[in-house]
């Protein structure tokens, strides 16, 4: 995220692609780990691969429907792809948690874009 803020998008993308390789290996070893699926979704989203990102998030939600990170990041993906109603569905899941993920997704919905 810091590289992106400094305008070093190419360098950030290189790190995300490298992370994907390690995450895919971890996912192969333990495909039922929602945290790994969340990170795979995040890294794919960051390089602009929204289709694969959404797949990883949705598989993660099948395993852990209330996973805070997945619900937040999938909601942000929906905001970034103009599916606000779907983003609000993810926000509803986070509603009772009184957590940072709820606040960040709510801000993304209100602003119409994600800071990530």
Q: Residue spans of the language-model regions?
A:
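Structural marker of alpha-solenoid helical repeat scaffolds
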Residues: 29, 63, 94-97
